[in-house]
Amino acid sequence: MSLIDIQNLTIKNTSEKSLIKGIDLKIFSQQINALIGESGAGKSLIAKALLEYLPFDLSCTYDSYQFDGENVSRLSQYYGHTIGYISQNYAESFNDHTKLGKQLTAIYRKHYKGSKEEALSKVDKALSWVNLQSKDILNKYSFQLSGGQLERVYIASVLVLEPKLIIADEPVASLDALNGNQVMDLLQHIVLEHGQTLFIITHNLSHVLKYCQYIYVLKEGQIIERGNINHFKYEHLHPYTERLIKYRTQLKRDYYD
C-alpha cells in the first residue's frame, strides 16, 4: 500500500522550462523508499514539491495527489505531526543557548496540547528510538554533543511527533562514513521495528543498495527506472542505472540537489 501517490508531477520555472517532467511517484508504507540520480536531476525539487517548499520562482502541477488513500491538494496541513522532514542541516535545528530538553519538549507542545510531563515522556521515547538516554541529553546544549549525537537528537525531534512519513533529504551527507552508517542503521531500525515510512533522497549508492526496499532513478527530471531492491540486484537495468551502480561513487550535488 502506498502512503503517497502523486501522478504526473511537473515542476517548471518562470520561463516555463520543465525541471521535473510529468513523473508518477508512489511512496510505499512501512518501507524505505529511495530517490537517486546525478547532480541537477531534480531530486530535492521533488521533496520540496511534496512539502510545498519550492522556491517562489518555481511552480508545480499534478493530475492527482493522494496521502494515505485520501485525495489532497496540500500537504502542509500534515507537516510536523504526520509528515516529518530530516535534512542534512541538523546543526542549524537547535540554538546554542537553550538546553536540548527544553527545545525538544517545545517541539512536541507546539503541535500537541499536553502537560510538560507528557511532553517529556514523548521525548524520552523518541530518544530511546535513536539509542540515546534522556539523562545524557536533556540537560546539555547542542554544542556539547558530537556530530553523530546531534544528528540522532535531530532525528528524535522528528520522531517525537510520531509521523507516519519521514522525508529525509541527504540525511547523512555531512557526516563521516562511520556516523553516516550508524544513522542509516537507526533509520532502518525505526522503519522495521516501529512501522515508520521513509522517503530518502540520497546520492549514496551503497546506502541505497544496502537499506532501501523500493528505488526510483531520476535523470534530467524524468524517472527512468523504478522497482524493488530485487529488480536492481537481479534484473536487466537501464544503461544509466547500470553506470550508477557500476561506479557506486557518491554523486555530486548542486543548488537544486
UniProtKB/Swiss-Prot annotation:
Residue intervals of the ABC transporter domain: 4-245
SUPFAM superfamilies tied to this protein: P-loop containing nucleoside triphosphate hydrolases
SMART domains: AAA
Record bears the keyword Kinase: no
PROSITE patterns: ABC_TRANSPORTER_2
Reaction equations catalysed: Ni(2+)(out) + ATP + H2O = Ni(2+)(in) + ADP + phosphate + H(+)
EC number(s) from the headed UniProt entry: 7.2.2.11
Localization: Cell membrane
Disulfide topology: none
Topology versus the membrane: Peripheral membrane protein
Origin superkingdom: Bacteria
UniProt-annotated binding residues for ATP: G37, E38, S39, G40, A41, G42, K43, S44
GO CC, any one term: plasma membrane
PANTHER family: NICKEL ABC TRANSPORTER, ATP-BINDING PROTEIN (PTHR43297:SF13), OLIGOPEPTIDE TRANSPORT ATP-BINDING PROTEIN APPD (PTHR43297)
Family stated for the protein in its record: Belongs to the ABC transporter superfamily.
UniProt protein name: Nickel import system ATP-binding protein NikD
Species whose genome carries this gene: Staphylococcus aureus (strain MW2)
Gene designation per UniProt: nikD
